[in-house]
Amino acid sequence: MLSTSGRVKRKNAAPLQKVGQTKTSVVDQLEEALQQRDFSKATTVLEFYKTTNQPVGDLPINPWLAYSAFHMNDVSKALDVYKELLSLDGCDPMHYIHMGCCHFVNGSYAEAEECALKGPDCSLQTRLLFHIAQKTYDEDKLLVYHQKLKETVEDQLSLGAVHFYRGHFQEAIDVYKRILLETREYIALNVYVAMCYYKMDYYDVSLEVLNVYLQSHNNSATAINLKSCNHYRLYNGKAAEAELRVLIDLQRSTYNVENDIVKHNLVVFRNGEDALQVLPPLLNVVPEARLNLVIYHLRHEQIEEAYELIKDLEPVASTEYILKAVVNAFIGQKLDSEEHLKTTREYFNLIGSAQSECDTIPGRQCMASYFFILRDFPNVLIYLRSIKPYFLNDDTFLYLHGIACAATGSFAEAEESLTAVRSEKVKAEFSYMSWLMRAHIMNKHAKRAWDIYLKMETSAESFNILQLMANDCYKVCAFYYAAKAFDVLERLDSAPEYIEGKKGACIGVFQQVFAGQEPADSLFDVMKMLDMSVQQHANDPKVSQQFESILKVIKDWVKESKLKKK
């Protein structure tokens, strides 16, 4: 998950001057700085004149100082100035709303609402209260202030922003496009539209829209950052970092970029490198930092740490629901907790069946996961097959797709997916080896399954693999490898089922050699196995005699047929 925001403030910007005209008055300098959005310069000028008690023409210093400080993201300074203004008799009550905006930016929503309500009834007050209601999840107030919005550009921009934050990206796009049709000079709205398409996973469309803005504003920090995020989704981390380098270079020369966002996204682009150093301080600064730290812990099998980070998070966005579902799935399996698994199923089903998500890749992954937990593998395959072209190199997808195929009897497809897995970590898992061996055996590739067993070290898992090998090979009449597996099992544990299994498999090999379906060499191997059983059970004459009888029949036939080992 990436942070696609990124506000900037101009640094050391040279003022634009018209040929033959030089502005010298402080008012002209201040006006020029404000028009160029060089709020750092404006703040510096105003603070100088304030501390030296010099007038700035007829302009009131404090209101403009607070305005400039707010827009350069020095909110604490802006708050101090507004408090000073409001302590004076006859102050403009609009400053209560301005101070409310400062509290809103700081995340102090109760204070923001208190200040806003002290101000006059106006469109700015409505917009501020509208955003506060959205941030505090007060649906009743949100509806009230929504109805008070007018068709002005400012009010409609607020509506678009709230749609965006609530995950209603298509509705936000509709608002922004309507404004663009009416007021084409608001070209920066293309960035907002591009951000919505990014959130909807339309990364190529997002880039196309974004380039409209970048053609005329190629040093926009927000646009560059969003472009790098799109490159990450479309290509890889290296391509994304190359785009972000443009922003880092601008930081050194032209802009003071919000370093937190750059640092956060670099961690993502570098696949979690330095995550434990960079992300924890950003948990309450960059919203995506918490989610990415959870992902880092999951990748490193630190399930408890991931759970602690996300357990109190009330999910709003689909990514939050999905991640919380995944963490609960891990905890549920580890603790055998039906409560956690129930939460997992509810969240996966909620996102996967949502109208806005059901036809997206994450939405279909959610439905596949939901049915996987229910062990409803036919439905799992419906969803996984629909998105398979997007995950041909994803080991986790190939693994789960292979399991679902094998569980529904599609063993050829299962073998194809499971053999495509490259991760050594996945290949070492008992579950993976079990499903792959079963797929090999069911596709008449029993030797491949036997080779997997031969590479295993002696353990409880290898014993279980032998049992699977013996039984599955017997079922599909791969009697030679069934005999080899039962032979090892019998030597490890002389249980009756292994003895009977070995006798049956050896007779099966004899029948197949007799019918020309199995090479003669296999029968000679079987004769050695039978001879070993005769010796192993010397203290149990009944069992020993059974093996000896089978061996005698085979030897007589071999002699009569003049069969020779190749």
Curated annotation (Swiss-Prot):
GO CC term, one of those recorded: intraciliary transport particle B
Disruption phenotype: Defects in new flagellum formation.
Location(s), subcellular: Cell projection, Cilium, Flagellum
UniProt xrefs under InterPro entries: TPR-like_helical_dom_sf, TTC26
Entry's Gene Ontology BP terms: intraciliary anterograde transport; intraciliary transport involved in cilium assembly; protein transport
Top-rank taxon, per record: Eukaryota
Listed GO MF terms: intraciliary transport particle B binding
TPR repeat residues: 59-92, 94-126, 153-186
Keywords, comma-separated and alphabetical: Cell projection, Cilium, Flagellum, Protein transport, Repeat, TPR repeat, Transport
Function: Component of the intraflagellar transport (IFT) complex required for transport of proteins in the motile cilium.
Family: Belongs to the IFT56 family.
Subunit structure: Component of the IFT complex B.
Protein name: Intraflagellar transport protein 56 homolog
Biological source species: Trypanosoma brucei brucei (strain 927/4 GUTat10.1)
Source taxonomy: Eukaryota, Discoba, Euglenozoa, Kinetoplastea, Metakinetoplastina
